């Protein structure tokens, strides 16, 4: 399970008017990494800066339910039971949680990020279902996320091993 981090973001009043039917994947616009993708220490400050930017626009705060970073950490945004402001349409915000990848449009979706997307969706109680462009005409969620979606949102290899059936010895212990 990916680590879920609560940065203690302060929100203005958030609506609980949401009837989620899935999770919409987003990316954060231009890449924030500029060659420093390995610097996980930058992730919390980038999430906080997005929150401050959204507040400056008069919004209630970070528009996303959660943010996942390339290193596999999930940062709580509005979280479960709160309406998003990220999907671009009233139906999108009503029917879907929004999980944003802390990356740009051409940044690859790392294996830890794929695990974090799946874990965030599980924690929100909904399946990964849409990319942002399915709600509104936009370049978001970028080609790498769209390609991952077209492939069926596969989780990283080796993260969901099939357990071996019990051996004869296990049954003989009874």
Set out the residue ranges of the language-model regions.
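Extended, low-complexity, turn-rich repeat/linker tracts enriched in Gly/Pro/Ser/Thr and Asp/Glu
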Residues: 55-59
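Basic/polar, cationic surfaces and motifs that engage anionic cell-wall
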Residues: 1-38, 42-45, 61-62, 70-173
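N-terminal post-signal-peptidase region of extra-cytosolic proteins
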Residues: 49-52
């Amino acid at each position: 399970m990916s680590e879920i981090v609560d940065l203690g973001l302060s929100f203005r009043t958030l609506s609980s008017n949401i009837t989620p039917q899935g999770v919409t994947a987003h990316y954060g616009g231009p890449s924030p990494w500029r060659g420093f993708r390995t610097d996980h220490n930058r992730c919390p400050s980038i999430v906080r800066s997005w929150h401050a930017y959204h507040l400056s626009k008069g919004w209630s705060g970070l528009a996303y339910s959660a943010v996942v970073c390339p290193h596999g950490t999930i940062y709580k945004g509005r979280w479960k039971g709160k309406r998003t402001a990220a999907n671009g349409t009233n139906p999108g915000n009503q029917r879907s949680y929004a999980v944003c990848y802390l990356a740009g449009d051409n940044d690859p979706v790392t294996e830890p990020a794929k695990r974090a997307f799946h874990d965030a969706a599980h924690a929100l109680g909904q399946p990964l279902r849409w990319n942002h462009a399915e709600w509104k005409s936009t370049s978001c969620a970028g080609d790498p996320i769209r390609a991952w979606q077209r492939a069926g949102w596969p989780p990283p290899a080796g993260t969901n091993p099939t357990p071996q059936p019990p051996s004869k010895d296990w049954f003989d212990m009874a």
